[in-house]
Amino acid sequence: DEDGMNTLGFQEEPELERVLGATGFTVDTLTGRILESDIFFNAIFPWSVAQSGAAGRFDLESTAVHEIGHFIGLGHSAIGETELVGTGRRVTAKQAVMFPIAFPTGNISDRVLKPDDIAGASDIYPGGDFSRSTGSISGRVLLAGRGIFGAHVTAFSLASGRIVGGFTLDGEGRFVIAGLEPGLHVVRVEPLDDGDIDSFFSDDADVELDFIATTAPSLVSVPRGGSSGDVTIEVRAR
């Protein structure tokens, strides 16, 4: 409800059988400012607040960290791997708390922010040193000479192994990945195939999925406090 308060609490939502929690917003449509945000945790699931987690129970802190990411304006990250199990998906690995699918019960890994989460939050709310101490990679993803929308682009730091991702967000196939540590990065493009499309984009978004995952032909150097300059990656249809 719109009451001017930000509320966190438990609520039984049996029809949301795959949803551990959710965050709702009241947004000023003129400025984009978040006026109010409420978080609920689905009480139909077994929960735990044990320091080391508990077998058969979902970790409340991990889910809260994810939902608070939405609370401050973060969307979902696609840095994760899943496998199909029945009618759903099971996470096999991920490097972002903001990946849309939780680890199985007993896991507490998502209590700790990953580089992709930190880069996203810092991009929205930059500290005094953020823009000066990090850099970015920008460019385009092309399929048969045309830009594609919704491709997942990642930057992997050779120095630290940190991974930060982003998406192509227009019909020209343009992307920007900010919050990167200076140095050489491997840039990779892949289709969104480890989560439901509507976890990342609206139902009517024209997301391109029919292409082969591709790595940029050369390493990309990220300068401190600046941008790599445009990087063009050409992908092939599959």
What are the functions of these language-model segments?
Residues 135-143, 173, 233:
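A short, amphipathic beta-strand motif
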Residues 40-41, 119-120, 124-130, 231-238:
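Conserved "repeat-terminator" motif of extracellular CCP/Sushi domains
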Residues 192-232, 236-237:
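Structured interaction patches on ligand/partner-binding surfaces of diverse proteins
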Residues 139-151, 156-159, 223:
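Structural motif
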Residues 34-38, 93, 134, 148, ...:
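Extracytoplasmic
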Residues 110-135, 143:
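Beta-strand-rich domain onsets/edges
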Residues 136, 148-152, 184-186, 230:
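Exposed beta-strand and adjacent loop surfaces of beta-rich binding modules
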Residues 1-91, 152-153, 166-168, 172-180, ...:
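Metzincin-family zinc-dependent endopeptidase catalytic domain
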